[in-house]
Amino acid sequence: MARPMITGALALAGMLSITHGAWIPIKASLAQVLLDNAWRETLYSGQSLKPWPWADTWPVARLSVPAQDKSMVVLSGANGAALAFGPAHVRTSAPPGSADNSVIVGHRDTHFAFLQKIKPGARLQLESADGAVHHYQVSDARVLHETDTDVLAATGSR
């Protein structure tokens, strides 16, 4: 009697473990669909729309790297919750697409992993919430510690 119960308990634990492991990628994929929808609605309506009702962030831009066929929604507020779903704009920096330092951050091992292949001269596009598309060229690529705030300083240029 004890052996079937142990076997059943182990089988249940295994299924729960697999389900939990699969939940994270499923949640991440669904989040990207919801972020894309919120971005399209933001462009259409001109209003900042949350991707889901309980979100504490919203799309503020779309960052694209055409040469790598990468495109991702940039979220407002560089906090842990936003960064779990994609790159995020540091609210204390200039708005995305403005003529000053606009800082967008992301985890280098997830959403910004493609930046390992970025070289000076690469072209980036940033679509701001007003629908304007801004073109940039990479001049330097480096990993900064979160306490390195020199990049937040206003420069008056893009």
Regions found by a protein language model. Name each.
Residues 4-158:
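Solvent-exposed, non-transmembrane regions of membrane-associated and secreted proteins
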